[in-house]
Regions:
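N-terminal Rossmann-like or analogous alpha/beta NTP/dinucleotide-binding catalytic cores
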Residues: 1-66, 73-191
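Residue-level signal for inorganic ion chemistry
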Residues: 88, 305, 357
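Short alpha-helical patches at coil-to-helix transitions and adjacent helical residues
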Residues: 81, 85, 208-212, 354
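Divalent-metal (Mg2+/Mn2+/Ca2+)-assisted nucleotide/phosphate chemistry catalytic cores
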Residues: 116-288
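Conserved phosphate-binding loops in nucleotide/dinucleotide-binding enzymes
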Residues: 116-118, 141, 202-205, 295, ...
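Non-catalytic terminal extensions that flank enzyme cores
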Residues: 1-72, 220, 228-315, 319-323, ...
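Short, solvent-exposed beta-strand edge segments and adjacent coil->beta transition regions
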Residues: 74, 197-201, 314
């Protein structure tokens, strides 16, 4: 099975295997549901998704939804970040409530960036977002106490074996690195804690799918109930719900029957039952999370090969750089030219290796 490292600077992700091994769906199957398809989807810059149908439905029906993404402030923002910034802004323009996290805890734990530099780089990211028209809530992980509380709750639903299976963590992995992963799970779920349960989309690069898979699993584990559509009825089954919540579910539906650990309901649709059960779960202290959705965009190639990464400054074109600096970087970028003029004439260039062409 393809291994994905969210912290690597090399684009070694086989996109086709993402679809076959991890169940990511191609973006084409939801485009007919979107009233006005944005250029980044139409041109296949965004190539895949998980459960984006529920977001497309919210856009089409003008129902509430959230959009969240995060940026690790390990360096200056650059062109490689522009795609996800535009995605977030577009989703806000379609009616979503916008959230952006500055992942300073991750930058400090994984890259060793000082808190002072995290603050400096983080403010640059937020300035770029504002320049693109972002309207919504922003925060630094280290300063959000509600986020930290949520991360602690999420951590009760995952063990180190699971983190090892997803991320390849070993005996030498720092605890702060593992904690930064759980903080990112909390980032993904935070909009539903802050503004109430609603479908949530997280636009990310394809290398960030491990975080999405972990967050989706934890969101499910943190629910009080599961809802199953059976033949002729809907079964609401307790996972860890208090008896009072189970009684409330029974009382909410006229033709419901309560059994040990579950309530079976005749009549009504699964959507209607799920909405009412969420209200009951929230009223009894639960989270009632929707499983988060995601979109995946392709990498912008770095000037030195690999992906454009803040941790490799010479690979990037940063927004703050002067024209002479950008020109020098571009002129020194890896191209698809051959070793000699004779080879170039005989064989031609290799555009797939050329960072400027790509």
């Amino acid at each position: 099975m393809e291994e994905i490292n969210p912290w690597s600077s090399q684009p070694l992700v086989d996109v086709e295997k993402l679809f076959t091994d991890f169940g990511i769906e191609t973006i084409e199957n939801v485009l007919p549901m979107i009233p006005e398809v944005p250029s980044f989807m139409r041109r296949r810059i965004v190539i895949g998704h998980r459960d984006y149908q529920q977001i497309a439905g919210c856009i089409s029906d003008k129902r509430p939804f959230h959009v969240l993404t995060g940026f690790m402030p390990s360096g200056h923002p650059h062109l490689g970040h522009l795609m996800v910034m535009k995605e977030v802004v577009w989703h806000v323009q379609q009616g979503g409530s916008g959230y952006v996290a500055i992942a300073d805890r991750e930058a400090h734990a994984v890259r060793g960036i000082s808190w002072e530099k995290c603050d400096e780089f983080g403010k640059e990211y937020l300035a770029c977002l504002c320049a693109l028209g972002f309207e919504g809530k922003t925060y630094f992980q280290s300063r959000n106490n509600r986020l930290k509380d949520l991360a602690f709750e999420a951590a009760t639903k995952v063990n180190f074996s699971e983190l090892t299976a997803i991320y390849g963590f070993g005996a030498d992995t720092e605890l702060a690195h593992a904690e930064s992963v759980i903080t990112q799970v909390a980032d993904i779920l935070f909009p539903q804690v802050d503004s109430g349960p609603a479908p949530t989309v997280v636009p990310v690069g394809v290398d960030q799918d491990p975080h999405i898979r972990l967050a989706r699993g934890i969101a499910h584990k943190m629910r009080m109930f599961t809802i199953e559509e059976r033949e002729g009825y809907i079964s609401v089954r307790s996972k860890n719900a208090p008896e009072a919540a189970l009684n409330a579910v029974k009382s909410a539906f006229p033709h419901a029957k309560k059994y040990e650990g579950h309530v079976d309901i005749k009549g009504g649709t699964c959507t209607e039952v799920a909405a009412r059960v969420r209200e009951i779960e929230r009223a009894h202290g639960g989270f009632a999370f929707y499983t988060p959705s995601s979109t995946y965009h392709i990498f912008m190639p770095g000037l030195t090969g690999g992906k454009m990464s803040s941790s490799i400054p010479e690979s990037t074109i940063s927004f703050h750089e002067s024209d002479p600096v950008v020109r020098k970087k571009v002129m020194n970028g890896i191209t698809g030219g051959r070793m000699t003029l004779e080879e170039q004439k005989r064989l031609g260039g290799e555009p797939d290796r050329c960072s400027l062409y790509l």
